């Protein structure tokens, strides 16, 4: 579907714990795995070490990057009238919308789906405490570092394909050259 995009963001923390949370990187890909937009973002404040250890984005990486007030408008434009899928959409989408509001960027109209909710239901592990399916971590299916926004987008795409029964990205014996 050309109107469906996959989004992932990496941040300075959790909005519920820190109202000044900023995005430090984001990626947006289409359903063919092609990059629509991917960028580091200068949060205008130091990235806490505990968070740097999770996603690997350091202050020196973002010092020359554009701030959200500039690049957020480009992302919002790309998301307009699209179906945006995110793994843990409640976190990623909420933060994008929050930062658009904070910086006076018009909030785009778009449809949202949470790949984590679908995957949790697919796995089927029930949480009596929540009265719902237990949230599952995003499996690292793409090459690269987990918690890199582009790698996480690619892993989300591969996960969606696998859940739908599409194993076309799986290597087959035809892909292996045994002439050595």
Where are these regions (language model features)?
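Residue-level marker for buried hydrophobic side chains located in beta-strands
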Residues: 5-7
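Metal-dependent phosphoesterase signature
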Residues: 53-74
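Metal-dependent phosphoesterase core characteristic of DEDDh/y 3'-5' exonuclease domains
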Residues: 2-3, 16-25, 29-57, 77-180
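Short acidic, Gly/Ser-rich segments with clustered Asp/Glu that frequently serve as metal-coordination loops
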Residues: 9-17
């Amino acid at each position: 579907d050309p109107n469906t995009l996959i989004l992932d963001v990496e941040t300075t923390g959790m909005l519920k714990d820190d109202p000044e949370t900023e995005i430090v990187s984001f990626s947006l890909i289409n359903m063919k795995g092609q990059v629509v937009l991917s960028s580091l973002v200068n949060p205008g404040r130091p990235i806490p070490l505990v968070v740097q250890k999770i996603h690997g984005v350091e202050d020196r990486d973002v010092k020359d990057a554009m701030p959200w007030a500039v690049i957020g408008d480009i992302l919002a434009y790309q998301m307009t009238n699209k179906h945006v899928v995110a793994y843990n959409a409640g976190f990623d989408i909420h933060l994008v919308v929050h930062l658009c509001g904070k910086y006076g960027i018009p909030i785009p109209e778009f449809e949202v789906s949470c790949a984590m909710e679908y995957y949790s239901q697919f796995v089927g592990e029930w949480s009596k405490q929540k009265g719902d399916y237990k949230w599952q971590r995003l499996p690292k299916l793409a090459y690269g570092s987990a918690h890199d926004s582009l790698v996480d987008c690619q892993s989300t795409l591969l996960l969606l394909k696998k859940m739908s029964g599409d194993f076309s990205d799986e290597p087959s014996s035809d892909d292996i050259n045994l002439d050595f």
